[in-house]
Structure formats: C-alpha cells, structure tokens
Amino acid sequence: MKRLALLGALAAVLPPAPSNAQTVGGVELIELTIAEAHEAMLAGTLSARQLAEAYLDRIEAYDKRGPAFNAIIMTNTRALARADSLDDALRATGGLTGPLHGIPFIVKDNYDTHDMPTTGGSASLEGSMPADDAFQVRRIREAGAIVLAKSNLAEFAFTAMETVGSRIPGWTFNPYQLNRVTAGSSGGTAAAVAANLGLVGLGTDTGNSIRGPSSHNALVGIRSTQGLTSRDGIMPLFAHRDIGGPMTRTVEDAVRIFDVIAGTDPADPVTAEADARRPPSYMEFLVDDLEGVRIGVAGQLAFTETADPEILMRFAAALDDLRGLGATVVDDFAIPDLDSLRRGLGCSRFRYDIENYLATLPDPPVSTLEEIEEGGQVHVTVMPRVRSYLEFEGTPDTHEGCVRARANEERLRAGVRGAMAERDVVALVYPTWNNPPRLVGDLESPHGNNSPILSPPTGFPAITVPMGFVWDETLPAGLQIYGDAWSEPTLIRIAFAYEQATRHRRPPETAPPLK
C-alpha cells in the first residue's frame, strides 16, 4: 500500500498544467480531434509520423514514469513504419487514404492484432499471436488508422470495478486522481485516451467496460446494439453480451470511428442485419438541438439510497440542460417490476467461449481454461473466478442457466419497450455511475454502477458522455443515454447536443504538455 500512499500524495501536490501548449506540426496535441489532425495533414503542416511520435513520447514520459498511469501493455514497433507509409500515400495522391488516416489508436489487449500479441491482460497468454486482426481492427486499419499501442485491462475482462491483471504488475490509475480507479475492464484505454497518450481508442463492453471506464475518465463511449458491430477476433468474456466500440474525448470522434466499425461481418452471424439497419453515415445525426425529442428519466437507476449527492446534483443539471436544448424530459418514468425483471439473467459461459477462442490461435500457449488454472499465471484476485467458471458444463444452448437467462432477457426487453412506448419516450437517461471513482483497493464502498442493468441484458445500445466533475471538481461523472435496438442515431443526436451545450470534458492535470 506504500505505492497508493505515494500516489495519493502525488495527486495532491501535482502542479496544474502549464499554460504552454504541446504543439506538433502546427496543431495543439492536447485534446486534438480527428478533424483537426486531418486538416493539418492536408495542409502539409502535420505528418502521421510526427503525430505518432508525439504520442509515443507522451507514453514514454507518463505511462511508466512520472504519474505512471500503467495503462499500456506494449507499444507497436511497426507504428512509425505504418505512419511513414501513410505519409507517402498522402504525398503521392494529395488525399487521405481513409476516414481514419494517420490516427493513432490505443487498442485494448483483448482485440486480435496480427502484428502484436493479444493476451487479455493475462500472463497465461503472454506472447500469444493471433492469426489475423479482429474485424474492428482490420476495419480501422483499412480506414488508415495506426495501432499505436495495446492497453491494459482487467484480466480476461472479468471486473468492472478496477483494472488489474497479471500481464503487467499493478493497477492502472485514474489520471484525474492517481489514487482512484479507472474502473474496468477497459481501464487502460480509458486512462491513455483521457491523458492524451493516444488520439482515440477501442474498448470492449460485456456489462460495463466501455461505458464505465469512459465515465470515470471523462470520455465518450459507445456500446452498440448487439449485432451492429462484429465480435470477431475479440477475446470473449460472455460472447452473447460482448461488444467492442470507441472510447474518445468527443462524441464526433466516437461517431467517426463508429461509422468505420459498424456493419455486417460474415464471420459473426449476429451482424447479419447490420448493413441493412445502419444509415450511410452516423455523422448526419451530429445536430445541436433536441426539439421534439422525448427522454425518460430512469429514476429507478439514479435515485438509490447510496447515490452520491453531488452526482445527483450533476444529473439534475444535465436534465435541465436537456430541457434547454428543446427536449421533453419525462421525470416520472418507470419500468414496472424492474427488480423482478432483473433476476435470472446470468449465463457464465466464459469456459465455453474462451476455449473456442483459444482454438482459433495458430500456436496457443494454453488450450483450455483448466490449463490456465493449473498454470497459475493469473492475478490472485482473478483465480477465484477462473475456478468458478470451470464449473460450466455443456454449451450455452443446453446449459440450464443460459436457457433460463435467454427467456428472462426477452421479458426484460418487453418490459423496457412497453414502458417506453407507454410514455412515448425514445431514450432513457441516468448517471453512468451513481458514485465517483473509488480509491484503488477499495472494493467495499458504494459504486453505483448502472451500466449492466439495461443495455447488456436487452442488447440495446447506450452511450456515455461527460456530465461534469464532483468532489471539488476533481472526479469525473458521466451521463448515460439508452434506447431501443438500432436507435444509435437518436442516442448520438442526444449525446452530441448535450456535449456541445455543456463542454464538460477537460484533460487531467497529471499529464501536462511536454516541452
């Protein structure tokens, strides 16, 4: 715990960010957006190499030194060569190679990458090389992106509460207060993007893991409709709930990525309808008014006995902001019998899913969950879950708990849809967390995690967007926006309008501009 005490002291004495900017290629690197980077690249003042080098310098300065966020498992040794090839292409053609040309990504280390190991944050899979890229990684590379680094995660994505595993020692720390958690499991991507160690990132979400860390790190995160984005090449936790998606500093950047990764993938049958369901571009829904939009307040999630009063104050202010944008906010919305509808939704199929994933690897270091358990190369906090998941027998189609969960999920979907139709609302809003980020090591105080309650078991989409800061303006809070299947256009419209009206996002002071 000496490390935690030192971090607490450091968090208290770190100076505010200096006023001088970190300029690269004529643009300000801190909080740089995709559009700003592309404008400078097309003007000839910024190269992809310059941009990648600038972020690599920040990783070198801040991830294992100084504040030591511990967000990055490894950087990509081929990143600069990739940047050079993109610069050559731009010089040759005068145009960008794609909508993500030269954009450095932080990718969670449960996405397959053909040129880097994929470990799921576990020493048991150290050096494990997949045969090819995950579908989403392939899509962003085809759009011109640079995979700059693989990020740390809660080992095997097991927990929403913290980011710690056996692949690299220690926790990943929250850049806003270094003695606080990032949440999990995509805490490495969240911390890195929040601290401007990369321009944007990819995370995954089974119950919380895009939206929770995004909220705790003042980011935007999108969990799509189940079936709109491919799971191919994502190391599974529970495959029926797993979704990958963007984690960014702005709604617009998240949507630019979402445009690239959403769609049908023959390798993932659940995406069969995706191309037919998605619009040509989600960018058209970046509008800054909400006239005619009816939004329900999910008070059953927000107004709990342990909810932090400052979070609720921020939530009340957010509701006023939505009204000011023209939305009709339905305060007394409720889902009948929600407590009973939430029961019996578990299907702990990790053993089945991880063994299917391991079978896709050309030379897996282990082939079964039993071998992972016997090898002992997992974090001490993870081993009890590994052993509990070993009890799963059969397949998700035959396992009694999974069969029961599917029926209960359908009841929950019907209950949510019925309540939304009754009140004629197109979206629900609630705090992403009812409580601010916990202290590292604290697994007892209230957390108020609302992300697993509606979106994962229904398969419906949700977006989190910064809602401001609490506790002397030091700890981030997030507003979550949830809707029916395929309602991403509406959710994006609400998120963008709210973001543009409030501008709550700000960078952490622990990672100031480099000189």
Residue ranges and their predicted role:
Residues L100-G244, P269-A272, A298-Q300, L428-P446, ...:
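Short glycine/serine-rich loop/turn segments
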Residues A5-P15:
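Bacterial N-terminal signal peptides
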Residues H101-G120, E284-Q300, S348-R417, P466-P476:
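Short helix-loop capping/hinge segments that flank enzyme active sites or metal/cofactor-binding pockets
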Residues E142, I146, A194-G296, T304, ...:
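Structural helix-boundary/capping segments
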Residues A17-A21:
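Sec/Tat signal peptide C-region and signal peptidase I cleavage site
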Residues I30, Y111, P117, I243, ...:
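Gly/Ser-rich, acidic/histidine-flanked active-site/gating loops
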Residues Q22-T119, A123-E126, F156-A160, T271-A274, ...:
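Short, well-ordered alpha-helical
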Residues G44, G102, E142, G198, ...:
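Glycine-rich, small-residue loops and helix-cap segments
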